[in-house]
């Protein structure tokens, strides 16, 4: 393992030429080794010396280029760690930090807390340590119980980098006050990269302000950090910005549905037990479907070809009638039912030609959801998604998939699967509420 290429150094130099001294962000040595796959009998410890040399060389190059800080992201530290994991982490950074010279190194963690290694982290020669105070359930407790080194800077992740809601200044400033009372040198930070939220709220022009005034996308979160910095240095409780923020959390329009609340409250443990028992269900199913020992089927969604997308876009823009839209999809379903029968599949699917996205489609069928125009986020690679927003209590007013499945079943004597995205996936692929628990939101869905 060695340094290859010059991309991070070129980008740093490009920004510096524009008068901007950036903080390079690199995936950390420990997380890198834990996520690699090894061949044969090789293991992470076999590459420790090479990785130490590579990362030390990286720090040397950034220092020569004029970088004041270099950030190493170590999200793997929030996992359950073994003693061997902690020993590897210490070995790596004892070696790397010994070569850091005059430059400053920030260790950044996110998506959890570092309860298994807090003492090990703070004992090493990092200049700054970034901790997630939102998803890190024990982060505040760890700092309060163990203290924080006076020779280091705490980068406190207090603005949510994963969700689109405005920060609750009152709660955030309480944490900042507690840290300042311990004479901890604090830098306000997001809980993680802003990669997970849309770019800016400026592009959202159709949603009413009564909703959007509760949102903060990436640009707005940067503004929140700046505003929180100012508030943290004054008697903020009578400050206009603080009071305006507090008023947002006093009201939340169109949010509560009493029927949904009552239904969720009535859920009992026995509701999660399927009846009849598995053996009885299995016997009934075998008799009903008469499938072979190894039946064949597909996941369910077939290619969203250009004509399928064109049909959906035309419907959304009002260029075609609902009847024309449905008729097009029915022809597609019929075409692919025939293909599946000719191939000889045993359990068929209708192809999901009506679905723009496996989550957004269902959100559009449910009350309690909001939909943005341009709030895109990266899913993977070049693929982006536009997650729906769970605004209020979620309910279903009518069947979501029945008509399509009934039509598809009418075309064949073979079993036709009905397909729905499950509630956990729908929740995790949406921007969830923060005023109720994820458990309650899941139960509602």
Segments (PLM) and residue ranges:
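Domain-level signal for soluble alpha/beta catalytic cores
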Residues: 1-445
